[in-house]
Amino acid sequence: MKTSDNERIKYEITGQAVLQILRMKINFSLQTLIKQLLVMKSAEEDAFRRDLIDSIIRDFSNSDSGGPNRRTATADNKSMFNGKKINRIH
């Protein structure tokens, strides 16, 4: 399979994980996304897709450069992109 096909499938899987988290109406964080991907991996029957999910988890785990003192999802309401406060809608 082409790399572009793999990337497309990885985006699809990531999107499915994000949508599932949003449906559960829980706070979204990188940790939550990784946990949802692990749940999806355990339920996946296709070995190729399991490998892709592993790859996605590694990508997200490596992008979390916070080191051992990582903030938890509930530590603050600041965007990881610009540090501005996020207004939460409940």
Curated annotation (Swiss-Prot):
Disulfide bonds: none annotated. Residues 63-80 have a biased composition (Polar residues). Induction: Induced by 5-fluorouracil. Strongly induced at 16 degrees Celsius. Expression is dependent on RpoS, repressed by YcgE. At 16 degrees Celsius with blue light irradiation, expression of this operon is absolutely dependent on YcgF for relief from YcgE repression. Part of the ycgZ-ymgA-ariR-ymgC operon. One of its GO terms (biological process) is negative regulation of single-species biofilm formation. Coiled coil: none annotated. Residues 63-90 are annotated as: Disordered. Probably a connector protein for RcsB/C regulation of biofilm formation, providing additional signal input into the two-component signaling pathway. May serve to stimulate biofilm maturation, probably via the Rcs phosphorelay. Mild overexpression at 16 degrees Celsius increases the production of colanic acid, an exopolysaccharide and matrix component, and reduces adhesive curli fimbriae expression. Both of these effects require RcsB. This is Probable two-component-system connector protein YmgA.
